[in-house]
Each structure stands twice: as C-alpha cells, then as structure tokens.
Amino acid sequence: MLFFFIYAWCHLSHTILQPSTKIQMIVRSKPESNGEKKLMNHDEPNDQYNQRNYPSEVYADLVSHFMNFAYGKVHESGLQKKGVRCVDVSISGCQFWNGIPLSASWCTSLVT
C-alpha cells in the first residue's frame, strides 16, 4: 500500500509539478569542457533507436542545480534544421530537489 502511494505521488507530481524551464544544451559524444556532465542512457539494451542513433553515453552543459538530475534518456523530437537536430533529454523517475518531486524534459541541440 505504501509503495502504491509513493508511486501515485510520483506520477501525480510529474504531471502537476513538472517545471516549464527549457535549457539549451549542446550534446556531444565526448566532453569538451570540465563543466559538461555525462548523460547516461538507461534504456533497455534492445532499444533499437538508441543503439542506432546515439552512443551509450553523451555529455552536455547543464545548469548547476540540475547536475544531480543529469541521468536520463535522449529522444529525438523530429525537429531538424541547418544540420542541428533538436532532441529532448528526459529525466526519468521520481527524483527530489529541495523536497519537491522533480521531472523535466529539455530541448537540446545535437550537432550532426
């Protein structure tokens, strides 16, 4: 019962409290500065999309207080322009920052 309550709270907080902040990041396959944080893909090993399009790990510039939430999945949004692909970095799971359940999706620029 407690597990169900926690799951329900995480699900509702994801829907209600999802921040609207959009952060522009350049996603690369290798780090180019000390300020870049590794993003790990937590997808299933048989996820064809990630195996086909992205390396197992990517790096990105992130705002400092979001550093603890830098582990998530990379999904292509379908928007492409002038050699730059727009992708969403989705932070999955029920994670807390200052006591607030936090889940976010940001638009990033993938240099192709």
UniProtKB/Swiss-Prot annotation:
Top-level lineage group: Eukaryota
Naming one, the record's GO cellular component terms include: fungal-type vacuole
The note filed under miscellaneous reads:
Present with 149 molecules/cell in log phase SD medium.
Name used for this protein in its record: Uncharacterized protein YHR173C
The scientific name of the source species is Saccharomyces cerevisiae (strain ATCC 204508 / S288c) (Baker's yeast)
